[in-house]
């Protein structure tokens, strides 16, 4: 009887206190990710998705022609920083809390990781991504106007014009596609990373919950999960097309996710839906290493330094 009681006690999932330092940690991690390799990969990926006739090398050359090395960091300050600081905090906090809730319901690490990531991704999209993706579109429009010889408007002027003409719906254009992208992104990344992590534990014999993976094992699991999550590239191409300001007389009006999918498939076939998948895989690996791999290690570091227990492990 005592052994049964001890086993039950060992299996109890403790409720971790919500830590403000953990929310700030999410913002700092994403800011670090986007300021290093994240933004260059994002710019190349978006260029390929918007110009589906470009190869990877043509996209790299095109971006370089728009400002050299600085061309790869267009939109970083302030728009990508605003997006990174808000979406990182939301993702890390919400997904951690959701994963704890799902584990409390009896779900295993893999299922809890997927559902925690999905919950964090959807919340991320509707809470922060509408404004941020609008600002990115404004930045792209400003550069296109300048390169075409027109008088470039300020970002805020274009933003005001969009809001004046289309209202809230205009500045949140494509938000449903963003929500689908985010929930499949982070559901895949957290779930696959946890699945790989469980496999590593079995191979290395670290089956006890108190056994820690070393940094290389943790980053390897995170990177593999991030790379595999690029399976949903079609929804990313759809998102770019819905928010693109590129003039195209053939593009249908009042685009929905379904209409955009049909248009891209008819225009460019299946290859068009996967345009930009190479930099996307690189971006997925880079983002996941930061948010999942370094995130877990950084939370443990914060706990040692501040005495606050991190919310949960993703």
From Swiss-Prot:
Which Pfam family, any one of them, does this sequence belong to? Mito_carr
Task: Please list the GO biological process terms of this entry.
Answer: alpha-ketoglutarate transport; mitochondrial citrate transmembrane transport; mitochondrial genome maintenance; tricarboxylic acid transport
Q: How does it sit in the membrane?
A: Multi-pass membrane protein
- Which InterPro entries does this entry report, sorted A to Z? Mito_Cit/Oxoglu_Carrier, Mitochondrial_sb/sol_carrier, Mt_carrier_dom_sf
The keyword Nucleotidyltransferase is annotated on this UniProt entry: no
Q: Which residues cross the membrane?
A: 23-44, 77-97, 111-127, 178-198, 218-238, 273-294
Ranges of the DNA-binding region feature:
246-259
Q: Is Nucleotide-binding a UniProt keyword of this protein?
A: no
Documented activity regulation: Strongly inhibited by mersalyl, p-chloromercuribenzenesulfonate, mercuric chloride, N-ethylmaleimide, pyridoxal 5'-phosphate, bathophenanthroline, and tannic acid. Partially inhibited by alpha-cyanocinnamate and bromescol purple. Weakly inhibited by butylmalonate and phenylsuccinate. Not inhibited by 1,2,3-benzenetricarboxylate or carboxyatractyloside.
Q: Which cysteines are joined by disulfide bonds?
A: none
Family per record: Belongs to the mitochondrial carrier (TC 2.A.29) family.
Q: Which PANTHER family match?
A: CITRATE/OXOGLUTARATE CARRIER PROTEIN, CITRATE_OXOGLUTARATE CARRIER PROTEIN
The misc remark on file is:
Present with 2930 molecules/cell in log phase SD medium.
Its job: Mitochondrial antiporter which catalyzes the transport of citrate and oxoglutarate across the membrane. Also shows specificity for oxaloacetate, and to a lesser extent succinate and fumarate. Transports isocitrate, cis-aconitate and L-malate with very low efficiency. Does not show uniporter activity. Helps to maintain normal citrate levels and NADPH/NADP(+) ratios under conditions of oxidative stress. In addition, associates with the mitochondrial nucleoid and binds DNA in vitro, although the relevance of these data in vivo is unclear.
- The protein's name is Citrate/oxoglutarate carrier protein
Please report the organism this UniProt entry assigns to the protein.
Saccharomyces cerevisiae (strain ATCC 204508 / S288c)
